[in-house]
Amino acid sequence: MMLSIPDVLNAEQLQQCRAALEGGNWQDGRLTAGHQAVNVKANQQLAQDDPLTQQLGDFILACLAQHPRFMAAALPLKVVPPRFNRYAEGGTYGDHIDNAVFSVPGTPHRIRADLSATLFFSEPEEYEGGELVVQDKRIKLPAGHLILYSSGSLHRVEPVTRGARLASFFWVQSLVRQDEQRSVLLELDDSIQALRQQVPDSPELVRLTGIYHNLLRQWTQT
């Protein structure tokens, strides 16, 4: 699954987040890299225990919970608290695959990474390079937009040669573990929503909605 989700943040929310991030205490991103990733990672991150990380992370989670497209596509059960990175002056992150399981700082909880997400804070014209490359697809979205993709995908961030690229990134444990099943549910949900707009009184809506929930019941893992 790979899906672009527009307008997770509106213009006012984006401006507030950008202002806070530009004054952030950025640290060497290699401090959070694993044994293999440390050799291919060259960026900056906010510390996970930085109050700004926690404040903006909570804000993003609240926005996502109110975004119907994200909820329908990800079917989130648990979300790793959002983190924040900055790429500038040649900053890059070579080919890697995300960890399968993440610990939640300060808790005994672990979260399986089914989906990876990047929320962009910089407009594409503000920097050169910096594309997120997932498999063979190059992604550079407008600020406030989010890309959602399978955590098992090989991906990288191309070197930033001008300007700076600010983003948030996090991982989702979905109610539905398998990408193929999640894609079927999203396609079915899209069809239900379209039918509701076209023929809101159709009895088929009840039937299709029942099929959706029965499939979700069959495939859900909690």
Curated annotation (Swiss-Prot):
Protein residues bound to Fe cation: H96, D98, H155
Cofactor: Fe(2+); L-ascorbate
Coiled coil: none
GO MF, any single term: iron ion binding
UniProt name for this protein: PKHD-type hydroxylase Pmen_0803
Cofactor binding notes: Binds 1 Fe(2+) ion per subunit.
Domain Fe2OG dioxygenase: 78-174
Pfam families the UniProt entry points to: 2OG-FeII_Oxy_3, PKHD_C
EC nos: 1.14.11.-
Protein residues bound to 2-oxoglutarate: R165
GO biological process, one term: intracellular iron ion homeostasis
Alphabetic keyword roster: Dioxygenase, Iron, Metal-binding, Oxidoreductase, Vitamin C
Species of provenance: Ectopseudomonas mendocina (strain ymp)
Classification via InterPro entries: Oxoglu/Fe-dep_dioxygenase_dom, PKHD_C, PKHD_hydroxylase, Pro_4_hyd_alph, Pro_4_hyd_alph_FE2OG_OXY
Enzyme category, top tier: oxidoreductase
Top-rank taxon: Bacteria
